[in-house]
Amino acid sequence: MPNLEIIFSSDECDIFYNTNLHIVQTFWKGVYVNDEPFRRILDEIINALELKKASIIIADAREMYVISPNDQEWILNSWYPRAVKAGFRYQGLILNKDTFSELAVKTISNQYDSSTVTTQYFNSPSDALEWVKEIQEAGAEK
């Protein structure tokens, strides 16, 4: 059973530190958010990476709404570089069944330099956490 330490909570998203796996986990709650409130949440993810010295994020985005084009651009040009500087190297994305949301998330991830951040897509949290264990067993997470 994972031991999740709450790092940040809002109406839109919860951010946890998984003390068993030494990863940051996010759970989007199905409340539409964009612009500054959305960016503040993503900045809290960077804070969690820095605080816990983690390199892996598992984002449960099944309840996430479409990301606006302005926010997509901000993620690519501002958030990703700062997250990488904070130690971000791997992301597992548990995707929404909404085709538009899935497309937006994959578009952003595929545009960022894959030599810096490794991305995998999953249908379930258990599959994503198994992937984390494989990375850690291979000694690749640092």
Predicted regions: what they are:
Residues 1-142:
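Amphipathic, Lys/Arg-enriched alpha-helical "gate/interface" segment within cytosolic domains
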